[in-house]
């Protein structure tokens, strides 16, 4: 697949994600006392869209297929170097937690391009006196598409964890699954500008 085809896939799925997010941006803000869980979520997405503090560069680093959940013949053939790139925007809330909107494309297990985009949130801890060092735990909600599923948009809700210092963060997720399907650790670097 050439570079232009990758750009076309990213544009196509960015439009789908934008159409899913746009209605949330029109939701009026309400006081904290009146918010329910879904309203809090949509307000956080909208605020991250409207008032980003940073722009982010995402660089996929590793995929690892859990060896206990796969036949060796499969893992020997799978790509575990997910070359790609992504961009996003993010902010830190008044509690010090991270919120981000992102779009990334990377080479999947079959060495085919896989776009993903969505919203991520992490509760952040700063266990050292140096506030630049942080740990995070949260989730991402978004949409992806895969070649082996004919690039049909697939919603995802996955856990997030991270360790960071200053503008650099090593962020990761785990895609659960069944035998020979899913059970993949995926990690990337996120650089904040």
Curated annotation (Swiss-Prot):
Site entry: Role in lipopolysaccharide recognition: 74
Reported EC number(s) for this entry are 2.3.1.251
- On whether Cytoplasm is a keyword of this UniProt record, the answer is no
GO MF entries: acyltransferase activity
Active site residues according to the UniProt entry? 65, 108, 109
At what residues does the UniProt record annotate the site feature described as Role in the phospholipid gating? Answer: 179
Places the protein is found? Cell outer membrane
Q: What biological process terms from GO does the record include?
A: lipid A biosynthetic process
Keyword line: Acyltransferase, Cell outer membrane, Membrane, Signal, Transferase
Question: What EC class does the entry list?
Answer: transferase
**Which is an annotated Pfam family here?**
PagP
Provide the Gene Ontology terms for cellular component: cell outer membrane
**Per the record, what are the reactions this protein catalyses?**
a lipid A + a 1,2-diacyl-sn-glycero-3-phosphocholine = a hepta-acyl lipid A + a 2-acyl-sn-glycero-3-phosphocholine; a lipid IVA + a 1,2-diacyl-sn-glycero-3-phosphocholine = a lipid IVB + a 2-acyl-sn-glycero-3-phosphocholine; a lipid IIA + a 1,2-diacyl-sn-glycero-3-phosphocholine = a lipid IIB + a 2-acyl-sn-glycero-3-phosphocholine
Q: Which InterPro entries match?
A: LipidA_acyl_PagP, OMP/PagP_b-brl
Task: Please give the superkingdom of this protein's source.
Answer: Bacteria
Keyword presence, S-adenosyl-L-methionine: no
Quaternary form?
Homodimer.
- Entry function: Transfers a fatty acid residue from the sn-1 position of a phospholipid to the N-linked hydroxyfatty acid chain on the proximal unit of lipid A or its precursors.
Instruction: Give the record's family classification.
Output: Belongs to the lipid A palmitoyltransferase family.
Query: Which HAMAP family does this UniProt record tie to the protein?
Result: PagP_transferase
Q: Write down what this protein is called.
A: Lipid A acyltransferase PagP
- Lineage in the entry? Bacteria, Pseudomonadati, Pseudomonadota, Gammaproteobacteria, Enterobacterales
């Amino acid at each position: 697949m050439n570079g232009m085809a990758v750009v076309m896939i990213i544009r196509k799925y960015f439009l789908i994600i934008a159409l899913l997010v746009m209605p949330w941006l029109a939701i009026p803000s309400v006081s904290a006392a009146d918010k329910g869980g879904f309203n809090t979520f949509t307000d956080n997405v909208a605020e991250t869209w409207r008032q980003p503090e940073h722009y982010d560069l995402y660089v996929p680093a590793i995929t690892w297929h859990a060896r206990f959940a796969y036949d060796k013949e499969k893992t020997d053939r799978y790509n575990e170097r997910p070359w790609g790139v992504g961009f996003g925007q993010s902010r830190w809330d008044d509690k010090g937690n991270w919120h981000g909107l992102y779009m990334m494309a990377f080479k999947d297990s079959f060495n085919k391009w896989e776009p993903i985009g969505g919203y991520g949130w992490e509760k952040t801890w700063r266990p050292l006196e140096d506030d630049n060092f942080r740990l995070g735990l949260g989730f991402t909600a978004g949409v992806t598409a895969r070649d082996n599923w004919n690039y049909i948009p697939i919603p995802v809700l996955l856990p997030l964890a991270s360790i960071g210092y200053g503008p650099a963060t090593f962020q990761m997720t785990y895609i659960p699954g069944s035998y020979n399907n899913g059970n993949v650790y995926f990690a990337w670097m996120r650089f904040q500008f």
